[in-house]
């Protein structure tokens, strides 16, 4: 189906290598989101993988693809329109935020990852910008952007260096300075830990304007729970994060294990998190400055192919 079958409206999103428009399908009058990707800015293999993944996935907490087509220099992905906007853009406007709300968001993310990992898909770029809300009125999450994702099998493990620095797992960073070592879907679980930490206090566990210091803190999992911001957060929540921000990937909780953690199953704390609103606003300013400063450098594109090797235990 050519682009002429759609009426383009306003731009609703922009990434390092793509632009997203609100569109209406002329025949059905239904609205969709159209992601337009410049072929010159992305590798052919990466684009093919993203399309293959989008065709394959079907889960209530993952943005669903309607169809795709291409021109000489562009790829067009027509996907489900989610109208709630990026998660953090929405919650930054809330006057208060509770541990229960953070749990419900994390739970939905975990459900999407249990599904993805069960069919051999690793997202590899979990960050707040890739978590969208389906409607403006609730906190139903939809995971998006599979541009760096990979399909893996039992005997295929990743060695490429990609992701977003503040959220990337230690084993991925190790591939920059050391001989590449294999890693698995555990990289996604580190991202869940970082996102959950931010949801509960409004700032990230790892941050430095000096990227070398940032990497050092990630590689050693140097983070804490400052009492001024974490004093009212449950011990179960802290334990949950500790189980995910574990340097050794084989000791890190899987998506299924995390979904069965007591914090996810039992937590119902509705007391507003202290200082949360001020901190999340400050963090959003920092994220925007990072994007302006680094631009595409915030995302590492794959620089090697997956390899048929077993991971080192």
Swiss-Prot record:
Protein name: Probable myosin light chain kinase DDB_G0292624
Stretches assigned to the Protein kinase domain: 6-264
Residues noted as binding ATP in the record, renumbered to the chain: 12-20, 35
Alphabetized Gene3D superfamilies for the sequence: Transferase(Phosphotransferase) domain 1
SUPFAM superfamilies: Protein kinase-like (PK-like)
Example GO BP: signal transduction
Coiled-coil annotated spans: none
Entry's EC annotation: 2.7.11.18
Molecular function per GO: ATP binding; myosin light chain kinase activity; protein serine/threonine kinase activity
Keywords, comma-separated and alphabetical: ATP-binding, Kinase, Nucleotide-binding, Phosphoprotein, Serine/threonine-protein kinase, Transferase
Family indicated by similarity: Belongs to the protein kinase superfamily. CAMK Ser/Thr protein kinase family. CaMK subfamily.
Activity regulation, per record: Does not have a calmodulin-binding domain.
Active site: 125
The protein's role, per its UniProt record: May phosphorylate a specific serine in the N-terminus of a myosin light chain.
Any single Gene Ontology cellular-component annotation: cytoplasm
């Amino acid at each position: 189906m050519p682009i002429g079958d759609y009426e383009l409206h306003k731009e609703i999103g922009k990434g390092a290598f793509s632009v997203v428009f609100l569109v209406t399908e002329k025949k059905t009058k239904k609205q969709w989101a159209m992601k337009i990707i410049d072929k010159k800015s992305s590798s052919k293999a990466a684009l093919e993988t993203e399309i293959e993944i989008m065709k394959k996935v079907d889960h209530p907490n993952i943005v669903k693809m309607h169809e795709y087509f291409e021109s000489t220099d562009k790829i067009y992905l027509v996907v489900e329109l989610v109208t709630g906007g990026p998660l953090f853009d929405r919650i930054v406007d809330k006057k208060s935020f509770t541990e229960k709300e953070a749990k419900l968001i994390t739970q939905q993310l975990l459900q999407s990852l249990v599904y993805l990992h069960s069919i051999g898909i690793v997202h590899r770029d979990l960050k707040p910008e890739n978590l969208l809300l389906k409607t403006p009125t609730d906190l139903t999450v939809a995971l998006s952007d599979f541009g760096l994702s990979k399909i893996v099998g039992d005997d295929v493990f990743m060695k490429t260096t990609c992701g977003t620095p503040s959220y990337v797992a230690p084993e991925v960073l190790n591939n920059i300075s050391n001989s590449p070592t294999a890693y698995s879907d555990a990289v996604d679980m580190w991202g869940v830990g970082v996102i959950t930490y931010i949801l509960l206090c409004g700032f990230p566990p790892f941050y430095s304007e000096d990227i070398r210091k940032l990497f050092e803190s990630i590689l050693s999992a140097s983070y804490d729970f400052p009492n001024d911001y974490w004093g009212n957060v449950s011990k179960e929540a802290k334990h949950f994060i500790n189980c995910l921000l574990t340097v050794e990937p084989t000791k890190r909780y899987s998506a299924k294990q995390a979904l069965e953690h007591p914090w996810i199953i039992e937590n119902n704390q509705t007391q507003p998190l202290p200082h949360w609103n001020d901190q999340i606003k400050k963090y959003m300013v920092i994220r925007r400055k990072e994007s302006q400063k680094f631009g595409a450098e915030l995302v590492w594109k794959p620089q090697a192919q997956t390899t048929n090797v077993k991971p080192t235990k």
